[in-house]
Structure formats: structure tokens, C-alpha cells
């Protein structure tokens, strides 16, 4: 195990760039995660952990190839993406996957233009809880492997596949797979979400501000509406996804 005390060390610079730049994460194929829980989840689910940086020696076994580095608290504070560092962070291979020829599962979630990383991570956590088969991102969503997204997913990013697609790729993939797309939308012709057939489907959810884009709406086989009080205009993406996922799971 090595010790690094300089904030200007190349590894520390690399970690700060992973924390702050989605383009750098894509370029390197790596992501940065912070917290002991996420490290345990990554190890349990077979993520390719590369470097562990901690204030105290990590007490649990790791593969021999994992680089382990000790740093003082002030260096940890300078590299951690968290406001309150938890004393350990790690880099790992971003678990991105090529878009498959078909989707073999039963239920998927499509997020369209959801730019808040907390919402994207929470949707990942929720679809994992309700046993959906994966997440498709389109329309400029938040980076699924950014630190805030990974933290909000509570490790689900290591257990459920995530694909980034264009609307055209999304439509082609769903057609090849024989999966209908249900879009959550505030439209007078939308079906009550409690009455939809969820036996096999993808659930499309847009951002709270603009909803689903025209490109994704045009792909939808039907639109569904979550009944709620007329006092409320809309639900945010993560809550809408949770309601529809629960409805499709029960």
C-alpha cells in the first residue's frame, strides 16, 4: 500500500478530473465513486475496481490488482466530490454496455432529457427495487456514471444495465424487441396508468419541466397518466418512475 500526501500528485489530478468532467469519464472509460457502501457493492457485483483511495487502510479484502492508496484527510477533502467525505473513494471501469440487438427482458425504463443526476440515480435504484431489466437514456440525460448519479443509485448502477441511445436507435431497438413504449404524459387521451397492461413494456419518462420530447412521444404506442390531485401540475421524473414501476410490478 502506498501513501500520497500531495494534492498535485498525478493520481489526485486524475481523480478530480473524473469527479468533474463527463467528457473525461467517457475518454478514460472510468468512473469515480465515493463511500464505503458503494465500494462493497462494487466488489460484490463484480465491478472492475481499479484504485481505492482512503484515509485509513481498507479493512476488507480486494483483488490483488487493485491499487490501494492512503491519503491524509486534507487531500481526501480536495479530491472527494462529496461535501462531507466518507474517508474512501475509488475508481472503476464504467459499466457501460454496447446497445444490444434486442432487449430480452420484460420491463425497461426510458428517461428522456432528465438532466438531474440525483433523479437518474434514484430511477436506477427504483427500477432495481422493482426488478425492471434496464435503463435507456436519450435526449441528453445526466451521465449515469457521474459521482452524484452513482451515489443516488445506491449501487444499482452495478446491478442493472444502462444504455445511451438516440431516439432513432430507441425506436429501432424496441421494434426489434417487440416491446411497446408507454409514455408518461399529461394528455387528455392518455390512459389511466392503473389500467395499462404492463406484461411487457418500456416506460418513458421526461423531465419535469418539458416532459417527453416530440421525438420520443412519436415512438410511444400509448401514453399513460398518473391520477393525482388537480392541485398538482406534475411529478418529478424519479417519483413518476417509482409510481409506474410499482404499478407494473404489483
Task: Identify the meaning behind each predicted range.
Residues 44, 95-96, 100-188:
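RNA substrate-binding interface of SAM-dependent RNA methyltransferases
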Residues 3-6, 69-72, 160-168:
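Short acidic-hydrophobic, aromatic-tinged amphipathic segments that line or gate anion-handling sites
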Residues 1-56, 141-142:
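Boundary-proximal intrinsically disordered activation/regulatory segments immediately upstream
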Residues 34, 90, 129-130, 144-157, ...:
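Structured adenosyl-cofactor binding patch, chiefly the S-adenosyl-L-methionine
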